């Protein structure tokens, strides 16, 4: 991983355009090729980013500024102009073992992948633990019409889980091979506040019956 602290300005050119004026920021270049720009006023979400596969080309013009051009397979560009570099270091972090889920959550994921029709008629599994630049989506599936659906699975559904799925959806919908991607928030219990937030963001909620998925007596699950 490469960490750069620099005064920089950033332009995104793609289906939409955006501009970040000059400020002091942290730039992360990860081993998977992803590039993200961070400020000091948010816990985790970058100001802008480019997901892999993407390619970084670094050039120096007539001025002392350094230009990074990050291009993805769709031809979208993240243009980062570094006016002053204060820190530039690289570290080899090695292979990460990944997040070890709570036993029930891990089993719920496994069971829902095996019984993906629980999500609705005609649903098919694409992959468990579908990797993104910010972590793995529990399940990536397709609905009966072939549209992509990201599924986040929790034992107890709270606002943090909805926020997590929202971040995944923002990222996945930037991939033209997957977009449009909708979301399903699945849990054994979903708090009312989380359900309200999910509905407001167009995310479907699914209350799971763990015993039913395990094939025991109960056959109840509810859609909201």
Swiss-Prot record:
Q: What does the UniProt keyword field contain?
A: Cytoplasm, DNA-binding, Endonuclease, Hydrolase, Nuclease
Pfam families from the xrefs? NucS_C (PF01939), NucS_N (PF21003)
As recorded in UniProt, its EC number(s) are 3.1.-.-
Q: Which terms in the Gene Ontology molecular function aspect does this entry carry?
A: DNA binding; single-stranded DNA endodeoxyribonuclease activity
Gene Ontology cellular-component terms for this entry are: cytoplasm
Q: Which domain of life is it from?
A: Bacteria
Spell out the CDD domains in the cross-references.
NucS-like
Report which residue ranges the record marks as coiled coil. Answer: none
Q: What class of enzyme is it?
A: hydrolase
Question: Where found in the cell?
Answer: Cytoplasm
The record's similarity note reads: Belongs to the NucS endonuclease family.
Q: What does this protein do?
A: Cleaves both 3' and 5' ssDNA extremities of branched DNA structures.
NCBIfam families in alphabetical order: PRK03298.1
Protein name (database record): Endonuclease NucS
């Amino acid at each position: 991983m490469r960490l750069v602290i620099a005064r920089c300005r950033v332009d995104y050119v793609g289906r939409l355009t955006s501009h970040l004026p000059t400020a002091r920021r942290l730039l992360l270049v990860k081993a998977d090729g992803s590039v993200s720009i961070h400020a000091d006023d948010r816990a985790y979400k970058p100001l802008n980013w480019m997901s892999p596969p993407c390619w970084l080309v670094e050039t120096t013009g007539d001025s002392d500024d350094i230009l990074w051009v990050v291009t993805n397979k769709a031809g979208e560009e993240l243009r980062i102009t570094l006016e002053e570099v204060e820190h530039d270091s690289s570290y080899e972090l090695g292979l990460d073992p990944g997040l070890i889920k709570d036993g029930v959550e891990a089993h719920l994921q496994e069971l829902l992948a095996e019984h993906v029709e629980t999500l609705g008629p005609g649903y098919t599994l694409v992959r468990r633990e579908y990797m993104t630049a910010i972590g793995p989506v529990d399940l990536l599936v397709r609905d009966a019409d072939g549209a992509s659906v990201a599924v986040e699975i929790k034992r107890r559904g709270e606002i943090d889980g909805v926020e997590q799925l929202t971040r995944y959806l923002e990222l996945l919908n930037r991939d033209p091979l997957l977009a449009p991607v909708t979301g399903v928030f699945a849990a054994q219990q979903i708090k009312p506040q989380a359900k309200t937030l999910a509905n407001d963001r167009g995310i479907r909620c699914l209350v799971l019956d763990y015993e039913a998925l395990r094939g025991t007596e109960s056959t109840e699950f509810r859609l909201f």
